[in-house]
Structures are given as C-alpha cells and as structure tokens.
C-alpha cells in the first residue's frame, strides 16, 4: 500500500489530501467538531491533534489509575509533527510485512455497506470539508489521544452500524510517542496500533462484539467481598495469547450467538452485493471493486487477527496474557519514543533501533495517576500505624455475583463452532496487490446519518482504607523495599516486625537466611582490594543462589513433589511456628488460597428423545441413537470444560496472583543485593587507591555477575511457577474433580434413562434388539473420565518472566557446520547470534555423526565473538565437542583459547603429548594447568570441560567418564573485553564436531546421557569412530584379536593373520543391495566384495567356512553394531546366523557361520 511520507503538518488545506473537516459530530462542548486532517494512504486519514470528543481539562475524580493527563499535550507544532511522523512510520512498519500489507489493504477496501436511495448509492464513510462541503472517503481517522494520554481506543461513528453488518467509520485515539515495559522489554507501538486497526476492521465489517458478551476472568483481590473480573470477548479475541488459547480449547461458552450472527450478517450483505448491487450500473465502479475485495475473505479470518499472531509475524516479544489484566501485576512506567532527528531517533521502520530489550528510552516526566483500589494499613495493638500498603486492580469490569449461579449449559448448542487458531500466514484471501491498484473512491455521494453520542466520563471511586492487625503479603513485599537515600547503606533483617516498627529507613526485610547471615557485620571498608572484592562478590552470589533457588522434596501431596520453602517467609503465607512444609501438610494446598473455592455446577438438562411416528426400523433407530450418543458425550465434555473454566477463575487465578507476588519478592531481594554490590563497587572507586584500569575490570566484571544474579532469580521464578501450576491442578483433582464425577453420574443416569425409555417405546423391534441397542448406547463412567494431569498443566502455562531479564538461551554457542557445492558454512544456532569468522582455507569433512571442521595447518582458524564469552568471576560455562587427531601429537599446540595473548586472562585448551592441557589465568596472574596425557589415539573422543565458579569446581570428562575434578578457588577474574574464542590447530591435524558452549555447568549424569545420545544412533563405525561408507576399502580385525587382520588362505578362505607381513590381507568393500546411500546403518543388508578379486563372501556348505565365491552365490548379510562398543560391527544372515572366528584349527582361526550364543568373537571392526 502506498503511504504518503514526509507530511508537513503546517501546510494549508489543499482540497485533496489536506482538509479542514467539520460538521459530522459534536465535541465535548456541544459544538460541531472541526479539525485539520491529512490523508496518509487511501481512505486513511490522520489528525495531528487531540481527540475532539473528550474534555482535556478534567477533574481529579475523573482521572483513572495509571493514566497521564496533560491538556497541553500536542498543542505545539513540533509535537504535532512528531506525532504525524510517528503514525506514518508505524503504518510503514506494518506495511513492511506481508501480513501487515494485507491488513492495511483490507482496511482500505472494507468500506461500510452503501445505502441505496432512489437508484443512487450513498456512503456514510466520509469526512466533509468545512469550506466546500466536499466529501472524502475515509474508513479510519487516527487522532491523538483523548483526555488520558496513554489510553488507546477505537470509537465507532455509529455503534448500531458497527454491529448490524452495515459497518461504520472508525475514529482511533492513539498515542505513538509513549510506550511502556512488560518485564525486560519495551512494548512495540506497532502492536498497539495494530490492536486499534484490528478493532477498526470489526467496525468496518459491522461485526463489533456486543459489550455484554463477557467471560469471567479471575477473582479480584478485594478483601471485603467475593468479586470477579470479566473480560469482553472482543478484547480477548484481539489480544490473543494464552487466555484466548485457553478459552478456545473447548469453546462451549459459545452459545452466545455472536459468532453465528456475525457470519450471517456478513453472508447477508455479501449476497446482496453479489446478486443485486454488483449488477447495478448505477454503482460507482471503484466502490464496487472495493466491496468485492471486502467480501472476498472468509469472515473467520478476521477472528484470527490478534496481537500474539502479529507479534510472531514481526518477531516481537508480547505478553501472553490479556493486556488489561496485566495492569494488576505491572505498575506501568512510560518511556518516550522519538521518530525524527530533532530529539534523537530511537525507532525506525524495523522497530526499536537497539531492539526491544536494549532500547535506550528515557522515562517520561509526566505525572502518572496513582489511585489504588485499596489502602491497607497494618496497625499494632496500640493502633499505631506500622506500614501503609496499596492494592491495585486490573482495568476490567467487575461483577459481584457468580457468573455460573443461574447458568444452564445448553444441550443442543455450541457443538460445532471453534475460533480459528491460525499459526500460518494471516488473511490468506486478501490480494493486497489487486486492492492497492483500485483507485480511491473519489466521487463519493454522502449519506448523512446521525453519529452515536460519545459517552460521558465517569467518576473514579475513592480508594477504600482498611486497618488490619495481621500483616498481608503486600505488607511483606513493601518491607523488602529500601526507601532511604540512594547513597546510604542499609541493613538486611530477618525480623519483619522489627523492620516495620522502627522509624529507621536503613532497616530492610529479607527472607534469605544465608544472605542475612553473610551480611551480618558486613563492613565495606574491609573489602579494599580487587582480590578481596572478587572473593566477596562470589560468596554473595553463592549465598543468594543457595537461598533463592532452594527447593525441598515433599511426599504425600498429590501432583506436588517439590516446594519452595521461602515463600512462606516472603509473603507471610502459612506462617506459624512450624515450617512451611509442616503447615502445608497440616492444612493442605487450599490453605494457600485467600478466597474459598466456589465452583458451581451449572444447571444441566438432557433433552428428551422425540418419539418416532411412524416407528422406525432397527437400522434407522441405530442411526438416530448414534447421533444422540455423540451429542450426549459432547454434553459431558461441555460440563467438564465449564468446570475447568471455574477452576481457572476461582483457583488457578489465585495461584497466578501468588506467583506474581513471589515474583515481586524475588525482584525486591535481587534489587537489594544489586544495590549492596554497586555500593561496594562505588566505595572501591571513591575510597581506595585501586588504579583506573583495574576499576574498569571490576566494573565490567560486576555487570557480568549481576547478569548471573538475574539468571539465578529467573530459575527461582521457574520453581515458583512449577509449584503453583502443580498445586492448582492438584486442588482441581482432589477438591473439584470428585464432585464433578458425582455431578456427571446424575447427568449420565438422566441420559441413560431417556435412551432406555426411547428404545423400549419402539414396539416394532424385538427384545433382543432392544438389549443390543441399550448395551451399545448406554453411557458409562469411562465416558466422563476426562482428567489428565499433564494436559491440564499444558492448558494453562503460567511461566512468568522477571522484570529485569528474560532467560538466556541455554547455549552461549551451538555450532552448525555445513558444506555445499559452493562454500563452507559455519553458523551459530544457539539464538545468541554469535559472530563467527573463519579463514578462507577452512576445510569441512564428514565427521563422526555430522560434518566436522578439519584443521591441518597454522593459517586455519575459526573465531567466535560474543559478549557472553566475557567471563568474569561468577560466570559458569561448559565446553563440549567431539575431536579426532589424525596423527600422533608430539609438540604443544593451542586448540582452543579465550585469551588475547599469552599474558591475558582467560582459559585455554592445548594439545600436548597425545593428550590435552586445560589452563586458566586470571587478572591477578594466578594460573592453573591440568594435564590429561596419552589418551588421543586417532579415534573420536567426546570432550567436556565444565566450570562452576560458585562452587569453584572444574570437571573434565572424556568419553562420558570423569577424568578431572579440581578445586579452582585460586582463580578469580577471567574477564576479557575481547569476548572472542579462537579454534585453531597450530600444526596438528584435528577434526572438530558438535562444538557447543553452555551457559551453565553440568553434572556427571547429564554428561553420560549426552555421550550415550551421541553414540546411540543408527550409523555403524570403523575402529576410529568414523561412519562406515559404502564402496570404500576396509581391512578387518576381530574384537578378540584387534591387532590381527583377516587374510585370505589360498585366495579362497578367510582366517586371522599369523605374522605382521602377510601379503594376502583381505580388503573389502560393502555393497548395499537395496538402496543407494553413502553411510552404512544398522540393519542394512549388504554383500561383501573382495577388493583384489572379483569375488564375494559366500559360504562353504560342507565346512560352514566363509569363502570367496562369484556374484550369484554372494551371501546377503545384515549389519548391526556391538551393544557395548559402537565401533564394532556384527554380520548375520536372515536366519540369525553370525559370522565369527572358529576355535583354533591347526594354525588357523577360520571365519565361519554359527548359530550359537553371540559373544565377542562375533564382533568385527573395520579399519
């Protein structure tokens, strides 16, 4: 779609694409609105000013929590210009993808249905010039925000037409200059605009979702009464994500007629257009062409448009939960976006210039309204205020009754429709190229229709204030926040009451015992050197890791095998003199809930079966009962998923709330630790004589440690989510599902009674036939036993990311090595986008399992560069790879290094004396060298080096076995700002395969499993671990005599070689008889050819010896590998007879065929 660029908002009206508009709707003063509009694309207009329908100078009582109000916003031309630039850039960004092009083109063609008036077709989608009264086609108008600067919304010009299928113009209130954060990333404003555009499409098509089509969402946190949030179906559809997926899993709430009615309206007007209007010569051709494209789609394609799908299309991060509900968990801060050079651009057509996570945006200085739902005062026995805390709620509407109280599940409805779950290309029916070629509708004939009055602003409720004597979780959370001066130190205390009772702001609550103990008596003046700092920061991180990631096994609670013991101390949950585990066992998981479960089984009624008149044959009765049986089973499933919905609302949402509280607790503790660390670093910079260069190393190393701190926090959060997910499903099983089963028995009895009565009422079938039908169509308990623990866990995934950092990919580097006809290709597939460079003469050859890098001279290298390789004091890592040296290693040569030069800090792996040397050197010149001698034997070996900087343990594994377990506490800071790892050979001939670097350490079991997974595959191998190939020459030895090769006796029989200089060695090639392939695999059927003679392996029937025969008598053999040694192969016939060595017969051990028990003498290796 063509989008006009570089629009100057100071240009005067020109009667084409700049128009002074007025006369269609009244503003907040009751006057006809007037504004200056700019056409930026076909049928799309932008107004660089505030929305006319809302009063900008509003009273405090009308301001909503989290809103920003400034009547002067967009009053200056410079600000208006940036608004215009921002909207145009966002439209161009959307238009820069295939799905975005389709969406914008569809918006331009989706003109509201015209009104026929005495043979003239008139449109209601227009703006009107205030001077000439000329009408201009407009499907959407994008304004600046209304009173609330951060409230994006879409207003239908006529709300009736927005729902009745005719369609109406949309007015969008939009804020492109401010954004906010979810977790560690900024919300891309393109997604916010897309949300408005999708809603506009609903209005243009006339399929707006009714306001009363709502679903209960969750229990609120109102301590006074039981209250539910409810979500409008339109918002849920457009947001997408986990909530829509969960609601759409089994959408048996769809007895609301919206989806069916919307499709009927679409089909109605489509039929009118195609059968009447399209044939009328009075219909303007461009209007007709746009209508044709409007109706060319499947209406369900509109319901697949949601923010989650577009985020996937744009490769953007986006919340998986409903936006408005998230406001309960995230107190938004807003940040400025700049689209032009004047303020310093930080956003372009590809999104944030530095990415969603690393974007450099300044926080706005505009005041954000703070209106909590409740103020909870914790008071002591003397009514003295200890701490004041605020409870906020989501932006959803509330109901104070149970949605399911008067609810009846329909028996005959909601059985077929399902919300489309599109994961491929969106809007596949839209031909944007064709639409864009259709000229704009120029000669518009306006149809004047009254607009829907704009709603008045509502008064926001005054926060309720409540005094409590028992601390709530919110009080515990607030006590963990340091509220003193930024440059002051503070003390961590495990005593909550002491913290809230004192007026000393330097006292902060911590529930982490090891951390509190470690900092007890902490004196930053004693940490005065870099070495002491390194030791100290490592211990801080280690204690934090022990405390925050700690879990305990628990037995006896269904579905829950681990608990997180600190959550009781963090939130005052189940806190008595007993431990968290003891209280949990004593009171059960339900004790974690603040509101009682209130699951109501809706009214259910199985419809009676109509009596047949005249009576049916047994075949017809069977057919009828089959339909009823399916309907009955479906009715049971509907009851099950309605029960699940209630469980989500009443139970799961409470656990989700606790999860977010635990998230806040983790973040609070993390922030405290970070502040202590940074204060200590600041002290070293101010008060000690440490030189500038060392201070720089200390600073960047600290950044790496803080990254580790945040990763540890995320691991703790994952433990929390896992516990609450399993706890919620456990409650469903133990407290809800059994009641559901009892309820189902009542329904089943009712349904079965109706089936029996119906069958017995048929007098034209025999009793035997009646019994047959009763047994066939009676429902049993198996028909409603739906519970599946794992499926229920997967249905609702509550994994929560912390606000600071998302989890990194597991691998810092995961190498992919490929070779095609034109070049070699070495890439990183870890997700970290590691920069890789390598010499032009690098070789890629077949490796053990995959393709391998082959290094055979000093000029060859592969460099890996990433900030993840800038190891510091606390960064754990694991290096693993397969390697094969192709010759004896006599001299020292470097294979792998993170060091810039010999004197640099870092680690290094050298080849030496047919072995390896692992070395580490820190910035304080401390160094270790670990020797692994004499194991390289030109075979493939699996090498793993794992470093845990918190436990100070280095482990090295060779072929899955532990070879080194070494304490490395004398090694401090390994930081290198080069961030480069070099792979080289320095004179040795080496193949490297499956090279990877993990961002953590690994233990013996994981190493062993990885090794087994590598070797346990279908490929057969030679003595060195290389894959066997067809049509390649090999010599053969036996497992029992590995040094003795097979040779030919009289050029007829095969036996073990006697003497090392035999001139008649047996050399073979393997030939696959069924298919043409390169590598030999398990269960392949082959014949074996003698290389020196045109002969093949056969059998001498008289002696059972293997002999050389012609092609027609060649023995077909099945190949397999040795169970314990993958480099050895077995040869067997289809009769399960194996080739083996005979017992010594004179001077020979013959190769024979035998059926006795398989053992080592049946195993052969090819060389």
Swiss-Prot record:
Residues 1-381 are annotated as: Light chain nLC. GO terms for molecular function: metalloendopeptidase activity; toxin activity; zinc ion binding. It holds the Pfam family NTNH_C. Induction: Part of a high-molecular weight complex with other proteins from the ptox and cry loci. Encoded in the ptox locus, possibly in an ntnh-orfX1-orfX2-orfX3-pmp1 operon. InterPro entries: Bot/tetX_LC (IPR000395), Clostridium_toxin_transloc (IPR036248), ConA-like_dom_sf (IPR013320), Nontoxic_nonhemagglutn_C (IPR013677), Toxin_rcpt-bd_N (IPR012928). Residues 805-1167 are annotated as: C-heavy chain nHC. SUPFAM superfamilies: Clostridium neurotoxins, 'coiled-coil' domain (SSF58091), Concanavalin A-like lectins/glucanases (SSF49899), Metalloproteases ('zincins'), catalytic domain (SSF55486). Residues 382-804 are annotated as: N-heavy chain nHN. One of its GO terms (cellular component) is extracellular region. Keywords: Plasmid, Virulence. One of its GO terms (biological process) is proteolysis. Has 3 domains that are structurally very similar to those in PMP1; light chain (nLC, equivalent to the light chain), N-heavy chain (nHN) and C-heavy chain (nHC). P.bifermentans strain Cbm (subsp. malaysia) is toxic to Anopheles mosquito 3rd instar larvae and less toxic to Aedes aegypti larvae. The presence of 4 plasmids, including this one, is required to kill mosquito larvae. NCBIfam families: botu_NTNH (NF033911). Belongs to the botulism non-toxic nonhemagglutinin family. Expression of the ptox operon (ntnh-orfX1-orfX2-orfX3-pmp1) in B.thuringiensis kills Anopheles but not Aedes mosquito 3rd instar larvae. The ntnh-pmp1 construct is about half as toxic. This is Non-toxic nonhemagglutinin.
